[in-house]
Amino acid sequence: MKLSWKTLLLWSLPIFVIGFFFWQGFLGPTTTDVGSNIASSRMTYGRFLEYLDMGWVKRVDLYENNHTAIVEAVGPELGNRVQRIRVELPASAPELITKLRKANVDLDAHPPKSTSAVWGLLGNLLFPLLLVGGLAFLFRRSNNASGGPGQAMSFGKSKALFQMEAKTGVVFNDVAGVEEAKEEFQEVVTFLKQPESFTAVGAKIPKGVLLVGPPGTGKTLLAKAIAGEASVPFFSISGSEFVEMFVGVGASRVRDLFKKAKDNAPCIVFIDEIDAVGRQRGTGVGGGNDEREQTLNQLLTEMDGFEGNTGVIVIAATNRADILDSALLRPGRFDRQVSVDVPDFKGRLAILEVHAKNKKMEPKVSLETIARRTPGFSGADLANLLNEAAILTARRRKNAMTMSEIDTSIDRVVAGMEGTPLIDSKSKRLIAYHEVGHAIIGSLLEHHDPVQKVTLIPRGQARGLTWFTPSDDQSLISRSQILARIVGALGGRAAEEIIFGDAEVTTGASNDLQQVTSMARQMVTRFGMSKIGPLSLESQGGDPFLGRGMGGGSEYSDEVATNIDKQVREIVSECYAQAKHIIIDNRVVIDRLVDLLIEKETIEGNEFRDIVKEYTAIPEKNYYISQF
């Protein structure tokens, strides 16, 4: 470990102080001068005067500015032998010298050495000097940390990271799956590098670009790519770094940030998680947060106020665009809003190709198959997936990852860590029937997603799992698809009831019932897919703030609410009856599949369908199932 001079100084100062006081106390001038004459016995001053009156004192040596005397005395009490005795003298005893002279006692005074006085003075001044020096050192460090030397108490200085030419190691070629957003930002970068091609036709540089999208979709990665490509000064800061414990700090930091940005224009200012400071004003109980609102007001003024900010492009990222203040979103501040959504199949494939560049894979590994099997995965999820697969490959001591590691990693990312396999018991058989109930319905219903695999290996909180893979990216879902999913979700409970009886139905279907109820209620209240008609009965005016939402209530009558509950119950009941009917009609193949599942613990989708085909016809679907 390399030690800096500051670290060495920090450790050496206490050692020096302790050593100095140790040396002064035990090796100082007092020990040198008096130590050779020090006596083992002591005597009070009054007793010393008695000895002097009786003529027993022969010699007196004075030390320490006449505060200490070494007395040579002889007498009956001392065994008639000369004894050296130490006597502490009072501060003021003018008659002592006179008495000693009258008694003809040898008297000698030993003044302290000049070096002793110097060391005494240094000893008295050392601690205060070290204290003052330490405080000055800490104060200087505090100033440097908050904005540079000589800027004491600079709480209002911006904490933005400034890079004249940002070297993030990320360029646009490293960003995949968000082609539309890349085009927007490539245009911004071109505007910064070659503004004349735009100004020639009267175009103005955009003042702000807002990145909106779910977590993990690559918003911050895009900002890093812009910083790596733009070759202009780049400021980056988080929205949470503006407001702190002191009043007025947020607005002051905004002013300081934009002052620095204007001094270095043209430049880019990136504000990550802008929702921390850009929330709507006047919300919440009590009217909101005054300090945050002052910061937001200052930000609004700096972005498009009286003075303007020519040459400064503000790029912000958030996954909560619905709570941002409307004044912040208007043109002139954020001219463009770029949506960065979860990637589709092509986007996932491009992202996997980027992250697979530095991974060793077997030739049989198909990135297209992985992309098909991971609908809904964000860019961060896909990066984590391949990293987990690489870790698992190293753990298994393989030279390259295979589809087996990738399949296990997908299961881990989606459902959690693998648990201990179940032992053969009635509970294991019940779980097997539950999972096969889901899978058989998913295979036989035309509009249901195809089965990928069925397993009894526990993961997370689930004792068993049935995996379905959508045949394509479904941005639009039909009524028949929703109903098929409801029937499939009820398949596990239906199998429990048909096989083991109503008394043996377990709590294992609790999560299924939550999903079923949610889907059925959305069919009625959001999508207009019930007998109530094409009505949206969900309130769209609710805000994610306690203040405005406290007074909100339902926008329909009690009669309509009762009808909604009736329609939800009717949809679920019809789907449950259909699920039980499918279970009863396919009891033979279900029993065979359960026995095979208990034996193997995992059945892949192709094998599952091949067995079902021996007993009944299966609707044609698109299958993207990995082969091992």
UniProtKB/Swiss-Prot annotation:
The keyword Thylakoid applies. Keywords: ATP-binding, Chloroplast, Hydrolase, Membrane, Metal-binding, Metalloprotease, Nucleotide-binding, Plastid, Protease, Thylakoid, Transmembrane, Transmembrane helix, Zinc. Its cofactor is Zn(2+). It is found in: Plastid, Chloroplast thylakoid membrane. PROSITE patterns: AAA. Its main location: plastid. Residues 29-118 are lumenal. Its EC number is 3.4.24.-. Binds 1 zinc ion per subunit. One of its GO terms (biological process) is proteolysis. In the central section; belongs to the AAA ATPase family. In the C-terminal section; belongs to the peptidase M41 family. Acts as a processive, ATP-dependent zinc metallopeptidase. This is ATP-dependent zinc metalloprotease FtsH. It comes from Pyropia yezoensis. The lineage of its organism: Eukaryota, Rhodophyta, Bangiophyceae, Bangiales, Bangiaceae.
